Amino acid sequence: MSERYSFSLTTFSPSGKLVQIEYALAAVSGGQPSIGIKATNGVVLAVDKKQQSFLYDTSSLSKIERVTDNIGMVFSGMTADYRLLLKQARKVAQRYFLVYKESIPCTMLVQDVAKVMQEYTQQG
């Protein structure tokens, strides 16, 4: 029965669930854990980076990236989604810096990246 409701990102099944969101959560649940700790003088970001195959070059798999001098991103989930969001975050941060000559506030950057995520959730 859920197949009838899985075609649309915004169509609820009779049980009140968004089937596409459940599919996405199932896909992401297989990701490696990541953690961020805020301290008084900085932050610590850590990820569990397991080699999936001996064919992978683990030095080329980075789950922590710098967005600006004072903002970093970490992910656990779909690599392609992360790359798109990282690229968007860097563009927004650069635009902000070109206009205001200072680093973008973290909350503003988070809001902009969240908008991108929301658009993809609603449009597919």
Question: Which residues does each predicted region cover?
Answer:
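Long, low-complexity N-terminal extensions
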Residues: 1-124
